[in-house]
C-alpha cells in the first residue's frame, strides 16, 4: 500500500463560549481554515479528490457541513465530501480514514480536519413537532444532548471524569496541578508566539469595521493553584472535577491536506510528516476518558513501536482526571506531553479538537526537529483514537 503524508495544516484561533466567534458558523470557520490549508500545501482546490471533515453539533447548519466547507473553499462540485461524527475524535479520525483511502489508491489528495461552533448550537423543542398536548414544553440544549452527555448512562461527561478520579484514586490536587501546568504552558507559548504559525486569522465584519481574531481566546493568564482550589465541584457535590480542571466549551476549525507520498514527490511538496499508524478502540462509556489507552496501544503495536519511541505527544485534555490516568497508565514522559498546554487551557471545540491537536503537534515537531509524534483523544460514548506520525 502507498505511504501517506501530511502536506499542510492550518487552524483558526480557538474562541471562548459566546466569545469572538459567537456569530461565525462552523462552516465559515471551516472554510477559512480549509482555504489556508490548501494554500499552504501549494496546490489548487481542484486537486482535492475528496473531503472528510469532522463536525458534531450540526443541528441547524444545513446538510453535510463537509460539503458546504469544501465548496466554500473552492473545491469543484464534482469532488465529494462527507461529514464524520465520532464526537471528540472526529477531526483526528478524518485523517486516519483519509489515509486508508489514499493508501488503497481510491484518492491521491484529500482535505481533512474538523470544525465546531459550540456557541451557536441551538436549543431543540422536541414536542413542537406534534404539539405539546398538555403542560409545559421543554427546550433541550443540543450542545449538552448531542455533545456533552453520555447517552448510555444519562449523565454529563463530567461524571465520567469523576468515575475515573474515583477508580484511579486521582486527587483534586493532582487534577489542579495538571490544569495549572496546562494553563502556564499555554500562556508562555502564546506570549512567545508559538501558535502564530499554525493559526490563520479570521476576519469578522461588523458595522464599526472588521475584527481580526488570530489569538486563542480561552487561555487564562495568571492561573494559580490558589485560584483553582477555590472553584467548586461542577458535576457532583463532593466531587473533584471543576471548571478549572476541565476543558472549555469552545469554537474553532482546523484543516489539513493529506496525500500519497508519491504524489507529494511528483508535485515537489515537502510534507510536514508521514502517517505511520493509527488506532481506535472502545472502553466502558462510564470511563470514556480512558479511551486513549487502548487506542494508543493499538497504534503503537501497528507501528511496532513503544511509547518511549515517541518524541512528542498531544493528548487531549478533556478533563484533568482522565488525562492523569492516561499519562500514568501509558507511562508517558510529562516532558513530552502537551508541551504548549492542552485543551484545559486552549479549549475543546469538540469536532475540531482532533485536527487542532494534530496541527499543534506538527508545528511543534517541526520547531524541535522531533522525529516522531502521537496525537490522541478520548471520545464520548466510550472510545479513544490515536494517530502516530514521523518526520
UniProtKB/Swiss-Prot annotation:
What the entry lists under InterPro entries is as follows:
Thiolase (IPR002155), Thiolase-like (IPR016039), Thiolase_acyl_enz_int_AS (IPR020615), Thiolase_C (IPR020617), Thiolase_CS (IPR020613), Thiolase_N (IPR020616)
* Presence of keyword Iron: no
E.C. number(s) listed in UniProt? 2.3.1.9
Secretion signal span = none
Superkingdom, natural source: Bacteria
Cellular component annotations (GO), alphabetically ordered: cytoplasm
Catalytic activity annotation: 2 acetyl-CoA = acetoacetyl-CoA + CoA
List UniProt keywords, sorted A-Z: Acyltransferase, Cytoplasm, Transferase
The record's similarity note reads:
Belongs to the thiolase-like superfamily. Thiolase family.
- Role: Catalyzes the condensation of two molecules of acetyl-CoA to produce acetoacetyl-CoA.
Quaternary structure note: Homotetramer.
What name has this protein been given in UniProt?
Acetyl-CoA acetyltransferase
Organism listed in the record: Clostridioides difficile (strain 630) (Peptoclostridium difficile)
Q: Which gene encodes it?
A: thlA
Amino acid at each position: 500500500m502507498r505511504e501517506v503524508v501530511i502536506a499542510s495544516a492550518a487552524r483558526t484561533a480557538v474562541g471562548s463560549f459566546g466569545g469572538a466567534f459567537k456569530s461565525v458558523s462552523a462552516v465559515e470557520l471551516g472554510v477559512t481554515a480549509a482555504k489556508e490549508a490548501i494554500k499552504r500545501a501549494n496546490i489548487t482546490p481542484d486537486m482535492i479528490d475528496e473531503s472528510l471533515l469532522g463536525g458534531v453539533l450540526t443541528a441547524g447548519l444545513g446538510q453535510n457541513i463537509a460539503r458546504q466547507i469544501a465548496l466554500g473553499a473552492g473545491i469543484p462540485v464534482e469532488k465529494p465530501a462527507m461529514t464524520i461524527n465520532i464526537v471528540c475524535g472526529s477531526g483526528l479520525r478524518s485523517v486516519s480514514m483519509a489515509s486508508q483511502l489514499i493508501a488503497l489508491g481510491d484518492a491521491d489528495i484529500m482535505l481533512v480536519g474538523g470544525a465546531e461552533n459550540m456557541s451557536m448550537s441551538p436549543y431543540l423543542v422536541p414536542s413542537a413537532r406534534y404539539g405539546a398536548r398538555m403542560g409545559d414544553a421543554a427546550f433541550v440544549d443540543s450542545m449538552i444532548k448531542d455533545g456533552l452527555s453520555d447517552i448510555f448512562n444519562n449523565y454529563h461527561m463530567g461524571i465520567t471524569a469523576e468515575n475515573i478520579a474515583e477508580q484511579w484514586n486521582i486527587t483534586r490536587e493532582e487534577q489542579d496541578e495538571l490544569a495549572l501546568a496546562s494553563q502556564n504552558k499555554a500562556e508562555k507559548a502564546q506570549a512567545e508566539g508559538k501558535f502564530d504559525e499554525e493559526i490563520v486569522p479570521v476576519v469578522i465584519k461588523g458595522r464599526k469595521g472588521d475584527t481580526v481574531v488570530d489569538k486563542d481566546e480561552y487561555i487564562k493568564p495568571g492561573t494559580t493553584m490558589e485560584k483553582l482550589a477555590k472553584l467548586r465541584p461542577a458535576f457532583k457535590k463532593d466531587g473533584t472535577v471543576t471548571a478549572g480542571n476541565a476543558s472549555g466549551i469552545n469554537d474553532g476549525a482546523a484543516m489539513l491536506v493529506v496525500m500519497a507520498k508519491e504524489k507529494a514527490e511528483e508535485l515537489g511538496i515537502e510534507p510536514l510528516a508521514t502517517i505511520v499508524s493509527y488506532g481506535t478502540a472502545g472502553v466502558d462509556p462510564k470511563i470514556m476518558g480512558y479511551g486513549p489507552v487502548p487506542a494508543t496501544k493499538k497504534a503503537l503495536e501497528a507501528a511496532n513501536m513503544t511509547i518511549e519511541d515517541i518524541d512528542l505527544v498531544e493528548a487531549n485534555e478533556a478533563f484533568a482526571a482522565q488525562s492523569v490516568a492516561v499519562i500514568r497508565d501509558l507511562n508517558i514522559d510529562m516532558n513530552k506531553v502537551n508541551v504548549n498546554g492542552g485543551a484545559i487551557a486552549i479549549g475543546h471545540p469538540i469536532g475540531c479538537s482532533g485536527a487542532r491537536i494534530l496541527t499543534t503537534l506538527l508545528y511543534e515537531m517541526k520547531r524541535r526537529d522531533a522525529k516522531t509524534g502521537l496525537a490522541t483523544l478520548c471520545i464520548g460514548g466510550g472510545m479513544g483514537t490515536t494517530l502516530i506520525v514521523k518526520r
